[in-house]
Amino acid sequence: MSDITKQPANNISSDDKKEVAKASAKSSVEGAKRKTFYKSRSRKLCHFCAKGILKVDYKDVNTLRKNLNSYAKIVSRRQSGNCNLHQRHVSNAIKKARIMALLPFVKD
């Protein structure tokens, strides 16, 4: 019974500890990755709320074109900065203007 050697409490042999130490040293030498911290952006102010516009007119094509992207798709609220109420008015006005042939359905 004197041949039995005591294992460490965490059951990791000294050889395994050396391998783990080598691997951790290798990863730190290869290059430590930096954490990227993103600056939170302030919320955009709704264009229509700022001007005090309650309803969006479908005949005002210049204003509606600002809410379309290059493929003539309606821009989302995040990109345009519109509030929920005005985004719904804008999307309905764009749809009416498309039916009246004031705005294109697809890219030219």
Swiss-Prot record:
Stretches the record annotates as Disordered: 1-33
Cellular compartments per GO CC: cytosolic small ribosomal subunit
Composition bias, Polar residues: 1-12
UniProt keyword annotations, A-Z: Ribonucleoprotein, Ribosomal protein, RNA-binding, rRNA-binding
Domain of life assignment: Bacteria
Pfam families (UniProt xref): Ribosomal_S18
Subunit-structure text: Part of the 30S ribosomal subunit. Forms a tight heterodimer with protein bS6.
NCBIfam families named among the record's database cross-references: S18
PANTHER family given in the database record: 30S RIBOSOMAL PROTEIN S18, SMALL RIBOSOMAL SUBUNIT PROTEIN BS18M
Described purpose of this protein according to its UniProt entry: Binds as a heterodimer with protein bS6 to the central domain of the 16S rRNA, where it helps stabilize the platform of the 30S subunit.
Protein name per Swiss-Prot or TrEMBL: Small ribosomal subunit protein bS18
